[in-house]
From Swiss-Prot:
It comes from the Eukaryota. Residues 37-46, 304-317 have a biased composition (Basic and acidic residues). Gene3D superfamilies: Zn(2)-C6 fungal-type DNA-binding domain. It is found in: Nucleus. Pfam families: Zn_clus. Binds DNA in a sequence-specific manner. This is Transcriptional regulatory protein EDS1. Residues 23-36, 318-338 have a biased composition (Polar residues). GO terms for molecular function: DNA binding; DNA-binding transcription factor activity, RNA polymerase II-specific; zinc ion binding. Keywords: DNA-binding, Metal-binding, Nucleus, Transcription, Transcription regulation, Zinc. The gene is EDS1.
Length: 919
């Protein structure tokens, strides 16, 4: 016989044994219209409560006492501010976890029988649901619980106090404990199983694994739970607090940062008239999260259609927010759009309106042309022409070609999004008004996904391109050249991303060169009369009533790939994969002489900076191809002769006004200094016999070293003023409103174009540091590494020369001037040290390499063993001076020390600026 004891609110309490029988369902709770009790199934007896079992969300957030009134249904604190009492927050469990009897069936777990669902503890991001061709890159990953992905729709007036299903949501330190064979049942009829490659396979009918959800409702509940989630996401918050969480800091540390890989999942619910959505990432800090919720609270939902025939590239790369609603006017099963209708219609990325819940492709493209293109044109064509290429509505294109076109465009968009999103600068302070995360929550979530799954996104996108390659090659005669141009541009973008990130392996560079060679891109530079028969070319196509010379465009792509190969060879000291001598290719194929139609950039200021950076890459290519290490059997007398002919790279007027010109001059002077220091070792006895020769050599070396220190100081100062973090900074160079309005092509003009339209003369066409503020340069990392190595090697020379002059006691007028010059160089060394500390992303890498440099390159006696010196040890032995006076003995040691510095500089030039030396 069950006894009912009235509680504080006058409602009967069920027998505990009866409650145990009814609580077998995981989400089942007592539903009574007037019940506001907090039952505990484990208690044997029940006594009346004198106060509310817990504070409401509003009082708990304000940390005040909750005085709940059962008659009004509102506590005193909420009544004063005019808000409603809500008890949506799920409190943390106390005590050990209790065992559950069994897993409840999906039929009983529905929103009709159980309106109290769970508060999500995790977040989710989309990933590829197909096969992983490179599973090793996504090895470190885990998945959140599928049953905790959706925000419930709870009416606060119906129930003020709910029984929290503690046993269903267990506190775990890591989500990686889920086994690969564990099956997860969901409340919406879907069944998920994690396979060996950590992919989520969809088995339910109503599950649509297409994209990411932007929360638009229950914002108060989201913000009230931020403080509780802060303790669970502390490691991720510490990463978000630093602006250097992106994968462009270190190639090795990035592999360990792939903590999880998950898939955004949406499904059709049973709640009428409510839109359910996923939570924001736990890594968002509380104040930032509240701002994002307020930004997205008033936006209407937009139903985006999905294509059932979309291939794995849709799931791999670009995904759009998909909402689920139980409104009968929007059925859950939509008809699939045919390929012909999809190809004939203009794609979503090129729409004429801007959607709030999906990033505009024009915005991504605009960020590239404003922050990347001005320094290195990965897409070697101006924006208006390239946008026209992306339009699939072209004449004489069959349906199969449209399908290939759409797939290639999807791969290109994925590569461009990875480049842009991973280089967006995340703000420490919440006062920033133009930060990427404050503009759109969906954009921020997508960027966080790309950062956490950097290598996997790159590998999947490149694997998709390799899969398309046989079809592209087999149908090369009927596929338009513009589609091939987008295909090879995507390959260049992927290699650009890895080199920009400082990747120390040729993961994609070798296969990319193979793809270009397979399509015979190198034959475009040969004087063939009939070029239309080549695989890359069909015939010139009309684009916007103008003719594009695709032969020039493909030549540009091959030259860009050659420069990327050069940068890897320059940094790592490895042989080049492309050894063609293009001559003056930059002036021939990239300048405005090629015609206004296929010009790289219409703005004169941006075009001038592009040409300067590409000429720097051309010079570094010439610098790498003339390495002595590639000529091991060269006669010893040729080692010290001036073989390098820099006549083609003469210093132009105003060259030192930009970073590229300064770095090119630094490399030239470094080559001259190496030759002078190595000549000292050969003429040691002759120099010591004549004091005048000794003074002349010291003077030349001192002046050359001081000028190099000044150049390094200027380079680092320009980099610091331009973009010390080498990331996209929307505060320093904000995008115009034209990228959001998208009304006309004139409005899409870049800021540099609008600036140059007001210039009165050609003298102002030079690109200044102000024009480059906030832009990203691929040359920045090699520059900083090379400057660090040079300063580390030649830094002791000014101090040594000053001590030598003072010890000799010759304080003539010329000597005093030399000492003043050397003292100025010492002051600049102090400033250079401070500048290196400012360049935080590069400073860590530089210090690590310097440690390897000095530890692994020293012998057991602690002396430096030069690799190049050991190669030429029998060819360039130093002469021994006879009858050397005691006063000249110190000079001899100094000269020998300078010769060792020359060998070290030669090792740096020959073996790479970030290589590891071995004994």
């Amino acid at each position: 016989m069950s006894h009912h004891v009235p509680n504080l609110y006058g409602t009967p309490i069920r027998d505990p044994h009866e409650h145990k029988r009814n609580s077998a369902s995981m989400g089942e709770v007592n539903q009574s219209v007037s019940s506001r009790n907090c039952e505990r199934g484990s208690e044997k007896g029940t006594k009346q409560r004198k106060k509310a079992s817990r504070a409401c969300d509003q009082c708990r957030r304000k940390r005040i006492k909750c005085r709940f009134d059962k008659h009004t249904g509102v506590c005193q604190g909420c009544l004063e501010v005019g808000e409603k009492c809500q008890f949506i927050r799920v409190p943390l469990k106390r005590g050990p976890a209790k065992k559950r009897a069994s897993v409840v069936s999906n039929e009983k777990f529905s929103s009709d029988n159980d309106p109290l669902q769970y508060r999500p503890r995790t977040h989710s991001y989309p990933m590829n649901s197909g096969n992983n061709y490179l599973p090793s890159l996504a090895r470190n990953s885990s998945f959140p619980s599928i049953s905790s992905l959706f925000v419930p729709s709870i009416t606060a007036q119906s129930q003020q106090f709910v029984k929290v299903p503690y046993d269903d949501i267990k506190r775990r330190s890591s989500l990686a404990t889920l086994g690969s064979d564990s099956s997860i049942s969901t409340e919406f009829g879907g069944n998920y199983r994690l396979d060996e490659n950590l992919n989520v396979r969809q088995e339910g009918k109503d599950i649509v694994a297409k994209g990411m959800i932007t929360p638009v409702e229950e914002m108060g509940a989201c913000s009230s739970n931020v403080r509780r989630q802060g303790s669970q996401s502390l490691p991720i918050q510490e990463q978000r607090a630093s602006p250097y969480i992106n994968p462009f800091i270190s190639g090795k540390s990035r592999l360990s940062s792939l903590s999880y890989t998950s898939e955004a999942t949406t499904s059709e619910g049973n709640t009428q008239g409510k839109t359910q959505c996923m939570l924001t990432p736990n890594s968002v800090r509380s104040i930032e999260k509240e701002r994002l919720n307020s930004l997205t609270a008033g936006c209407p939902n937009k139903k985006l259609g999905t294509d059932g025939r979309s291939d794995k590239w849709d799931k791999n790369s670009t995904w759009k927010p998909v909402y689920r609603s139980s409104n009968p006017s929007h059925p859950s099963t939509e008809k699939n759009v045919s390929l012909n209708q999809e190809a004939s219609a203009k794609p979503l990325m090129l729409g004429t309106y801007r959607q709030f819940d999906a990033i505009s492709f024009y915005k991504v493209l605009g960020i590239y042309y404003n922050f990347f293109h001005i320094n290195f044109p990965v897409i070697p064509i101006n924006k208006s022409k390239f946008t026209d290429m992306l339009d699939p509505e072209k004449p004489n294109v069959i349906d199969e070609i449209r399908q290939i076109n759409n797939e290639i465009i999807q791969c290109f968009k994925t590569a461009l999004e990875v480049l842009v999103f991973c280089k967006i600068k995340q703000r420490r302070s919440s006062k920033s008004t133009k930060s990427w995360s404050h503009d759109n929550l969906c954009d921020f979530q997508k960027g966080l996904y790309y950062i956490q799954n950097f290598n996997k996104c790159i590998a999947d996108c490149f694997q998709s391109l390799i899969t398309i390659k046989p079809v592209l090659k087999q149908n090369s005669s009927v596929i338009p050249s513009r589609i091939k141009f987008i295909y090879f541009s995507t390959i260049i973008v992927l290699n650009f991303i890895l080199i920009l990130a400082g990747e120390e392996s040729s993961l994609l560079l070798g296969p990319s060169v193979g793809v270009f060679n397979e399509f015979q891109a190198h034959k475009l530079f040969l004087p063939f009369e009939n070029t239309s028969s080549m695989l890359l070319l069909n015939s010139n196509e009309e684009s916007g009533d103008e003719i594009l010379d695709y032969a020039v465009l493909f030549k540009r792509l091959y030259i860009l790939l050659n420069i990327l190969d050069t940068l890897q060879s320059f940094r790592l000291g490895q042989p080049k994969l492309i050894n063609l001598n293009f001559g003056s290719a930059i002036e021939t194929y990239f300048s405005d002489k090629t015609g206004h139609n296929q010009v790289v950039e219409k703005a004169p200021v941006a075009l001038d900076n592009i040409l300067r950076n590409l000429k720097l890459g051309e010079f570094i290519t010439y610098f790498v191809l003339n390495r002595k290490s590639l000529q091991v059997n060269v006669p010893h007398h040729l080692l010290f002769t001036n073989q390098t002919d820099y006549g083609e790279f003469a210093v132009e007027k105003g060259e030192h006004d930009n970073i590229a010109g300064k770095f090119e001059t630094l490399l030239k002077k470094k080559k001259i200094l190496i030759r002078k220091l190595l000549n000292i070792e050969q003429k040691n006895d002759h120099i010591l016999e004549n004091c005048c020769n000794s003074d002349a050599e010291m003077k030349n070396i001192g002046e050359l070293v001081c000028s190099m220190i000044t150049l390094v100081s200027g380079i680092l100062d320009s980099i610091t003023n331009m973009n010390a973090e080498n990331s996209v900074d929307l505060d320093s160079k904000p995008l115009p409103n034209a990228y959001f309005a998208q009304d006309s092509e004139e409005e899409l003009m870049s800021p540099t174009q609008s600036i140059t339209s007001n210039l009165a003369s050609e003298e102002n066409t030079r690109c200044t540091t102000k024009d480059l503020m906030g832009t990203v340069s691929i040359f920045m990392l090699p520059m900083v590494e090379e400057c660090y190595n040079i300063i580390s090697l030649i830094g002791p020379i000014p101090t040594t020369l000053i001590s030598l002059y003072i010890r000799n006691g010759n304080m003539a007028k010329g000597i005093n001037d030399r000492i003043m010059t050397l003292s100025t160089a010492l002051n600049e060394l102090v400033q250079i040290t401070a500048l290196f500390n400012t360049l935080e992303p590069f400073r860590k890498n530089a210090h690590d390499r310097a440690k390897r440099y000095y530890v692994s390159a020293t012998s057991s006696t602690g002396c430096y063993e030069s690799v190049m010196k050991s190669m030429y040890s029998g060819k360039c032995a130093a002469s021994n001076a006879s009858n050397v006076a005691p006063s000249e003995e110190e000079n001899k040691k100094i000269l020998k020390k300078f010769a060792d510095i020359g060998w070290k500089l030669m090792d740096d030039s020959e073996l790479g600026c970030c290589c590891c030396f071995f004994n």
